[in-house]
From Swiss-Prot:
One GO BP annotation of this record: photosynthesis
Descriptive protein name: Photosystem II reaction center X protein
Organism: Prochlorococcus marinus (strain MIT 9515)
Family: Belongs to the PsbX family. Type 2 subfamily.
Keyword terms, alphabetized: Membrane, Photosynthesis, Photosystem II, Thylakoid, Transmembrane, Transmembrane helix
Predominant location: membrane
Amino acid sequence: MIQISDLLLIANVSPEVAGSSGFNMIASFFAAALLIVIPAATFLIFVSQNDSLDRTSATRRR
């Protein structure tokens, strides 16, 4: 079985570049979570809670 380090040497990629690339990929995942996923989830939870309250109060009025 070929080791990852052998693949990096065959591809002529230095370990520093590979490490930097991996770090930047993980950092971009965290940035996406902070900028997109967390605000979207917060908004959806807020809207669903308000909709639930509106439906509950509308049912009581009938």
